């Protein structure tokens, strides 16, 4: 593997999941790697064992004789002394995604994009490859217990990447196979208009080489429109719309699904998926399509999908009690994701009372989608809306925007039991009253609601609400 005359790479924020994987790949490819991070730990220790020089803290002299400096989205270049020093010395400074795109040129790059389903589909493909005896390099924006983390640096020819559309990062990647899982309004703080978002997805899909393939879900109207803009070979998949790869005879069962895959005129019955929800069947169809494209035998694809055990924060079972009490944690933070997650709970556990606990993420998203969130939540038996998790936004910039907007929208959508509770301790007290037999308490959101889910699961275990274990 060569990057011109570049031999010495310095990585700012080298301890992050995505950055450490790039560092490991560079080290195993013969590059000299240095880096810095504010934290230390096992990841840093491992990189040092592989030969990296890593400093704790940022200093201008760390840049040294580097040929290029790479930084992550978590680093602010305008205030980082190492990046400023590199720029003064005329050393190229690039984002993580640009380096990743260059490294992908030496692999068969499988990039999974979409408004929803990226993390799960990427993990399904990775599991499928590993179960088939392959040794892929994998980078996922979530934590997989099967993969023992979010990254794998393999020796094989495939590189499986979660391609994030935020800030147009995925346009720096160089996919051989581009998966477009879903497409609807999201990240308008980056794109401004839907036309700009559509243009970026079209540009991403058309980045595949003439011998590559685009794999797209035609159940999404925006993707059906996108197909007319493709100038590359493509495979379609879906459940509702006619497609090259489809699911039929779909049966939802507690904790998963069983279905038949119809692909290019062939039928593959008895496909079992150990994660619930129709949306996960679509994710599995994307992975199945990728498997066929890279030449995996169908029986190995099916076995790989059956081995998929889920991701942390993707319908993650945190507590399972002997009396039927379940506590689930999910990353859903867009109306479509919330709707799909509530639906998965409703279909998978038909006899359970479904209690949805939702923390809105970002003031801007809450303001834009309050009505849609209300409708998405309304199929739950009881709804609790927590305070908004601001992330990168400031409260004072969004006067009057609170979780009550979502709660009121849910009431207008017909929900009977709706509570807005911004106080975490009060919310926990209320949920303790909900923790009865055959009840599924579903925590959703991209913010710190996950910590509340963990606390509540521990409370259920400690208080002996039912015989079971917190996960």
Curated annotation (Swiss-Prot):
Gene Ontology CC: one annotated term: cytoplasm
GO biological process terms on file: cell division; cell wall organization; peptidoglycan biosynthetic process; regulation of cell shape
Keywords: ATP-binding, Cell cycle, Cell division, Cell shape, Cell wall biogenesis/degradation, Cytoplasm, Ligase, Nucleotide-binding, Peptidoglycan synthesis
Pathway(s) of this molecule: Cell wall biogenesis; peptidoglycan biosynthesis
Chain sites annotated for binding ATP: 114-120
Catalytic activity, reaction form: UDP-N-acetyl-alpha-D-muramate + L-alanine + ATP = UDP-N-acetyl-alpha-D-muramoyl-L-alanine + ADP + phosphate + H(+)
Record keyword Transmembrane present: no
Family annotation (NCBIfam families): murC (TIGR01082)
Family of this protein: Belongs to the MurCDEF family.
Protein name: UDP-N-acetylmuramate--L-alanine ligase
Originating species: Chlorobaculum parvum (strain DSM 263 / NCIMB 8327)
Taxonomic lineage of the native organism: Bacteria, Pseudomonadati, Chlorobiota, Chlorobiia, Chlorobiales
Gene label: murC
């Amino acid at each position: 593997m060569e990057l011109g005359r570049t031999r010495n790479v310095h990585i700012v924020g080298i301890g992050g999941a995505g950055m450490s994987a790039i560092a490991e790949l560079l080290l195993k490819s013969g590059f000299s790697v240095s880096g810095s991070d504010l934290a230390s730990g096992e990841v840093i220790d491992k990189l040092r064992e592989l030969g990296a020089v890593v400093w704790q803290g940022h200093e201008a002299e760390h840049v040294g004789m580097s040929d290029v400096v790479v930084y992550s989205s978590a680093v602010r270049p305008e205030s980082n002394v190492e990046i400023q020093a590199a720029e003064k010395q005329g050393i190229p400074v690039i984002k993580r995604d640009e380096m990743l795109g260059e490294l992908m040129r030496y692999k068969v790059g499988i990039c999974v994009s979409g408004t929803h389903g990226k993390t799960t589909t990427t993990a399904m493909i990775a599991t499928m490859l590993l179960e088939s005896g392959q040794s892929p390099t994998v980078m996922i924006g979530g934590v997989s217990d099967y993969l023992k983390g979010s990254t794998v640096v393999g020796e094989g020819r495939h590189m499986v990447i979660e391609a994030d559309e935020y800030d147009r990062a995925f346009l720096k990647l160089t996919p051989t196979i581009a998966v477009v899982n879903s497409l609807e309004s999201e990240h308008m703080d980056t794109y401004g208009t839907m036309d700009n978002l559509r243009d970026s997805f079209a540009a991403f899909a058309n980045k595949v080489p003439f011998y590559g393939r685009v794999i797209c879900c035609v159940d999404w109207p925006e993707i059906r429109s996108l197909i007319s803009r493709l100038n590359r070979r493509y495979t379609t998949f879906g459940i509702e719309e006619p497609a090259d790869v489809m699911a039929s005879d779909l049966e939802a069962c507690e904790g998963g699904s069983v279905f038949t895959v119809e692909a290019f005129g062939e039928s593959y019955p008895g496909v079992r998926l150990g994660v619930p929800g129709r949306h996960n069947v679509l994710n599995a169809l994307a992975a199945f399509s990728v498997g066929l494209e890279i030449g995996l035998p169908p029986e190995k694809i099916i076995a790989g999908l059956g081995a998929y055990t889920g991701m942390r924060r993707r319908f993650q079972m945190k507590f399972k009690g002997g009396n039927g009490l379940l506590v689930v944690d999910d990353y859903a933070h867009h109306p479509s994701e919330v709707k799909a997650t509530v639906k998965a709970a409703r279909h998978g556990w038909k006899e359970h009372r479904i209690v949805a606990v939702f923390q809105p993420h970002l003031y801007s998203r809450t303001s834009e989608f309050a009505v849609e969130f209300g409708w998405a939540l309304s199929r739950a038996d009881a709804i609790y809306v927590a305070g908004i998790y601001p992330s990168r936004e400031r409260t004072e910039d969004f006067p009057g925007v609170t979780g009550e907007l979502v709660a009121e929208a849910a009431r207008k959508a017909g929900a009977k039991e709706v509570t807005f509770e911004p106080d975490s301790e009060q919310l926990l007290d209320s949920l303790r009253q909900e923790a009865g037999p055959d009840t599924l308490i579903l925590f959703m959101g991209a913010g710190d609601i996950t910590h509340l889910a963990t606390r509540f699961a521990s409370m259920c275990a400690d208080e002996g609400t039912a015989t079971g274990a917190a996960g």
